[in-house]
């Protein structure tokens, strides 16, 4: 029992380290499960299940949510183009960014900016 508890604490530390890493590097288009598993020297399946277990959300969903939240901030507080914002928040293409934005928020980037 003690060993399991210790392992969970280690898992929590890894999961929190992953959160910090994502928060600092959300703009990297290469940010992915594979990159994070490599960075933290753990397997992809372990990282995936650990993240879901500790945060109650899939890793890819968390990354997407962080990127969209940052984009919302840029849309409201800057005059940057949608293309530039999509690059800054880690999307390889403006189209995939716009689709993700609409999927997460329910409205388009231009509608959000006007609201």
Say what each PLM segment does.
Residues 1-6, 19-31, 51-55, 72-81, ...:
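Basic, amphipathic alpha-helical hairpins
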Residues 8-12, 30-33, 40, 61:
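Conserved phosphate/pyrophosphate-binding and hydrolysis machinery centered on Walker-type P-loop NTPases
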Residues 11-15, 82:
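The cytosolic transmitter module of two-component sensor histidine kinases
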Residues 14-18, 22, 63-68:
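Generic hydrophobic, amphipathic alpha-helix propensity
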Residues 17, 70, 85-88, 104, ...:
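Residues within well-formed alpha-helices
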Residues 35-42, 47, 51, 85-92, ...:
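Append "Primarily bacterial transcriptional regulators
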Residues 53-92, 114-115:
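Terminal helix-turn-helix DNA-binding modules in bacterial transcription factors
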Residues 99-115:
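…primarily DNA-binding HTH/wHTH and HhH modules…
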